[in-house]
Structures are given as structure tokens and as C-alpha cells.
């Protein structure tokens, strides 16, 4: 990490179909080897599947799923006098979103369905109903923070 100054935030353009910035960030995270058109196809088809399953606006479902995955606290390691403590820290909004996106993609990739579209649609539907691997990851993170609440005075 550079000590001189923080890296500039890059401008992300909204996606073509829904005009949503968060969806673009999601696609960029899903993209492999710079193949954005493939990532777009996967996301749009997954959202169409979600729409046919639960008859709601797909972009609303996507945002609700992300909200259900976003962690409010996490633990960070802090070394104090030879011992390493897991200190609970509140998560900044940008990091919340980034973690939720990352967890959702990882959970979708680890599912058993045949295509990535099916996996992503399934994980989105699970996340909306507050179940699934990505939501479990958030719950585990919150449990870790709760268990280490005693060390919260070591914040920095």
C-alpha cells in the first residue's frame, strides 16, 4: 500500500439495461479475463430468471439481496503486546458493498447448478429470502464480531 496518497477512485458507468452503477460493479467483479460481454449476458439472464420466478422487478431483487448480504461489522487483527486480538470494527459503506458483491459471486460459483446464470439466480433468490451461502457468511462475520466484543476498546 502506497504511503504517499490513496489511489484515485475510478469512474464506473451505469449499465446499459437498468442504468445501475452497483450492477456495473457487480458485472466487473464477475468478469473473467476482461470478457465483459460474457459477464453482462450472465447477469442479465440471471436477473430475467429471477423475474420469472418471483414476479418482481429484477433490479429491486438484486438490491434487496445485496442489502441482506452486506455486513455491518467485521473483525480485524490487531497486535497488542505479543498477542493478536480479533477486534470488531464497523464496516465502511463502500467496503460493505464490495464485500457483499464478492461474497455473492463466490457463493454463486460454489453452487451445484449447471450454468452460472442458474447459480447466480439461485443465490440471488436465496439471499432475498435471507438464506444461502452468502447470507451465512455475513452471519458468521457478525457472530465473530459479537464473540470478540470484549476487545472493541482496541479499535484504531
UniProtKB/Swiss-Prot annotation:
<dbReference type="InterPro" id="IPR005717">
    <property type="entry name" value="Ribosomal_uS7_bac/org-type"/>
</dbReference>
<comment type="similarity">
    <text>Belongs to the universal ribosomal protein uS7 family.</text>
</comment>
<keyword id="KW-0699">rRNA-binding</keyword>
<keyword id="KW-0687">Ribonucleoprotein</keyword>
<dbReference type="Pfam" id="PF00177">
    <property type="entry name" value="Ribosomal_S7"/>
</dbReference>
<comment type="subunit">
    <text>Part of the 30S ribosomal subunit. Contacts proteins S9 and S11.</text>
</comment>
<protein>
    <recommendedName>
        <fullName>Small ribosomal subunit protein uS7</fullName>
    </recommendedName>
</protein>
<dbReference type="InterPro" id="IPR023798">
    <property type="entry name" value="Ribosomal_uS7_dom"/>
</dbReference>
<keyword id="KW-0820">tRNA-binding</keyword>
<dbReference type="GO" id="GO:0019843">
    <property type="term" value="F:rRNA binding"/>
</dbReference>
<dbReference type="InterPro" id="IPR000235">
    <property type="entry name" value="Ribosomal_uS7"/>
</dbReference>
<dbReference type="GO" id="GO:0006412">
    <property type="term" value="P:translation"/>
</dbReference>
<keyword id="KW-0694">RNA-binding</keyword>
<comment type="function">
    <text>One of the primary rRNA binding proteins, it binds directly to 16S rRNA where it nucleates assembly of the head domain of the 30S subunit. Is located at the subunit interface close to the decoding center, probably blocks exit of the E-site tRNA.</text>
</comment>
<dbReference type="GO" id="GO:0015935">
    <property type="term" value="C:small ribosomal subunit"/>
</dbReference>
<dbReference type="InterPro" id="IPR036823">
    <property type="entry name" value="Ribosomal_uS7_dom_sf"/>
</dbReference>
<keyword id="KW-0689">Ribosomal protein</keyword>
<dbReference type="InterPro" id="IPR020606">
    <property type="entry name" value="Ribosomal_uS7_CS"/>
</dbReference>
<dbReference type="GO" id="GO:0000049">
    <property type="term" value="F:tRNA binding"/>
</dbReference>
<dbReference type="GO" id="GO:0003735">
    <property type="term" value="F:structural constituent of ribosome"/>
</dbReference>
Amino acid at each position: 500500500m502506497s504511503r504517499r496518497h490513496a489511489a484515485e477512485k475510478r469512474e464506473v458507468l451505469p449499465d446499459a439495461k437498468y442504468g445501475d452503477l452497483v450492477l456495473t460493479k457487480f458485472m466487473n467483479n464477475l468478469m473473467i479475463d476482461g470478457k465483459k460481454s460474457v459477464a453482462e449476458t450472465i447477469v442479465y439472464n440471471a436477473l430475467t430468471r429471477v423475474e420469472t420466478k418471483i414476479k418482481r422487478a429484477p433490479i429491486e431483487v438484486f438490491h434487496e439481496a445485496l442489502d441482506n448480504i452486506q455486513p455491518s461489522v467485521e473483525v480485524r487483527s490487531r497486535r497488542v503486546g505479543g498477542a493478536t486480538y480479533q477486534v470488531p470494527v464497523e464496516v465502511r459503506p463502500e467496503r460493505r458493498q464490495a464485500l457483499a458483491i464478492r461474497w455473492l459471486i463466490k457463493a454463486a460459483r460454489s453452487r451445484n447448478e449447471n450454468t452460472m446464470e442458474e447459480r447466480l439466480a439461485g443465490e440471488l433468490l436465496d439471499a432475498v429470502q435471507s438464506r444461502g451461502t452468502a447470507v451465512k457468511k455475513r452471519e458468521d462475520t457478525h457472530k465473530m464480531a459479537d464473540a470478540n466484543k470484549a476487545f472493541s476498546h482496541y479499535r484504531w
